[in-house]
Regions:
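Active-site activation/catalytic loop segments of kinase-like enzymes and analogous catalytic loops
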Residues: 1-32, 36-56
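Basic, amphipathic N-terminal segments
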Residues: 52, 61, 65-172
Length: 172
């Protein structure tokens, strides 16, 4: 119920879930009372997974932010040394994941011509996997939207379950 509705549990989905299950096997009274608790646990796990993904992406975005900052500062103060910063980044083998690439592209695109060089390097690295910067930026945007919807649905569902009259639920 949690994965199919992306964390959204409402009266209709909850009663449909219970009714569908009971077409196979009738639930005992204790099992009916436990359903809201089990769904709460599943929603909390859904929030944990989304939170862990968001935290991991934040680490990648921070890493990109730091590299972009170094490159922008170097391009402004000592443009000839920019290639050394790019080489340092390349040696650090940054993760070519959507959060890192999207943040680096966001910070560097449209800056100076010199700052197009690290983006060209990333584009080359991504092309080895059949990807582009644009694809990863789009993927990152979609993932952020998915996480936002999942978090919102899960929190709303927890509120719904907190307000649920369990006696009425079990008797229905």
């Amino acid at each position: 119920i949690i994965s199919h509705g992306d964390g959204r549990v409402d009266p209709e989905s909850l009663s449909g879930f219970v009714a569908a299950y009971q077409t196979v096997t009738a639930l005992k009274l204790g099992e009916l009372w436990a359903i809201p608790i089990m769904i709460r646990l599943a929603l909390i796990e859904n929030l944990r997974r989304a939170g862990a993904r968001i935290a991991s992406d934040r680490v990648d975005r921070n890493r990109a932010h730091e590299w972009a900052g170094q490159m922008m500062e170097t391009a402004e103060k000592d443009p000839k040394s920019l290639i050394l910063v790019i080489a340092d980044m390349a040696r650090s083998n940054p993760p070519m994941v959507s959060a890192f690439v999207a943040e680096l592209a966001r910070r560097l695109q449209g800056q100076s011509a010199a700052l197009a060089l690290p983006l060209t390097w990333i584009e080359q690295r991504l092309s080895e996997s059949g990807l582009t910067i644009e694809q990863l930026v789009q993927s990152e945007t979609q993932q952020q939207a998915i996480d936002q919807v999942s978090m919102s649905n899960s929190i709303g569902s927890l509120r719904f379950l907190a307000a649920l009259d369990r006696r009425e639920f079990v008797e229905a």
